[in-house]
């Protein structure tokens, strides 16, 4: 499977101290996305201009001549780049980085098991996010099963934009869903994320009616969904769900993803 990050000692991705596994690939393309490197399901080369010192080491090792050093920094000829990662390997300042590394199920489990002492003492666990973890259902299910066999608390941070069958399969193996709710109007949802919201709302109602534990996270973004009408419609919809926890986290917008 392709991951683009593993975050240890996470305290905002579910109860206790957790390890968060970032799975690459997402069917949404939110205009405010703070992890745009997680959208593509393939490995990518990332370049951060402000980190670049203009040493040219990446240019020297590129096997296809795809890189050029200019006054504006490194320019990549996308038609020549094979995403081999040689440039990232030699970059001394991490201006060039690869987003996406292949892991086996066993490799991911070894990383998770390293953190069990912190999980046990804090009643924490593992959180799978992305990207969109439901876009890699077979990998996600395998990891959830392995974690469940070890008694590790399992959370899935998701948009719920997936087939009902995928959601049901994950439901059987998950202790907590962290659900991102973007917009109640389907047209606006498509405009700002690239997909409509009917499937998301239907899946959310399904997990609620199944008695699953979940909490809602709403990023409030001026000009997108922070208006009174959308907030009121969100509250009305959530109040209609058979939902014991009834926790909604309102997340202030930040522009950390602009530089990515």
Where are these regions (language model features)?
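N-terminal pre-triad scaffold of radical SAM enzymes
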Residues: 4-57, 74-83
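Fold-independent oxyanion-binding glycine-rich loops
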Residues: 6, 24, 36, 78-79, ...
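Structured beta->alpha junctions
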Residues: 10, 51, 80, 100, ...
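Hydrophobic packing within well-folded, soluble alpha/beta domains
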Residues: 30, 52, 58, 62, ...
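Iron-sulfur cluster-binding cysteine motifs and their immediate structural context
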Residues: 31-38, 57-75, 86-102
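Extended, non-globular alpha-helical segments
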Residues: 47-53, 100-115
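Conserved AdoMet/S-adenosylmethionine-binding subsite of the radical SAM
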Residues: 106-256
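Short helix/strand-capping connector loops at secondary-structure junctions
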Residues: 259-260
């Amino acid at each position: 499977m392709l991951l683009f990050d593993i975050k240890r000692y996470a305290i905002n991705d579910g109860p206790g101290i957790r390890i968060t596994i970032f799975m690459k690939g997402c069917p949404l393309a939110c205009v405010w996305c703070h992890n745009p490197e997680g959208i593509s399901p393939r490995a990518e080369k990332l370049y951060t201009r402000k980190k670049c010192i203009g040493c040219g080491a990446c240019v020297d090792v590129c096997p296809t001549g795809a890189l050029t050093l200019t006054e504006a920094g490194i320019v990549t000829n996308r038609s020549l780049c094979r995403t081999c990662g040689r440039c990232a390997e030699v970059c001394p300042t991490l201006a060039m980085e690869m987003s996406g590394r292949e892991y086996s199920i066993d490799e991911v489990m070894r990383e998770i098991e390293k953190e069990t002492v912190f999980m046990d003492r804090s009643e924490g666990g593992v959180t799978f996010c992305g990207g969109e973890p439901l876009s890699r259902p077979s990998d996600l299910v395998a990891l959830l099963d392995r974690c469940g066999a070890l008694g590790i608390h399992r959370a899935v941070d998701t948009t719920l934009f997936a087939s009902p069958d995928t959601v049901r399969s994950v439901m059987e193996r998950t202790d907590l869903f962290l659900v991102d709710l973007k917009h109640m109007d389907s047209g606006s949802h498509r405009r700002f994320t690239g997909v409509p919201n009917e499937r998301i709302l239907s899946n959310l109602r399904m997990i609620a009616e199944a008695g699953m534990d979940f909490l809602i996270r709403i990023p409030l973004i001026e000009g997108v969904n922070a208006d009174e009408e959308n907030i009121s419609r969100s509250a009305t919809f959530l109040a209609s769900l058979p939902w014991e926890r009834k926790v909604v986290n309102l997340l202030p917008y930040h522009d950390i993803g602009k530089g990515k």
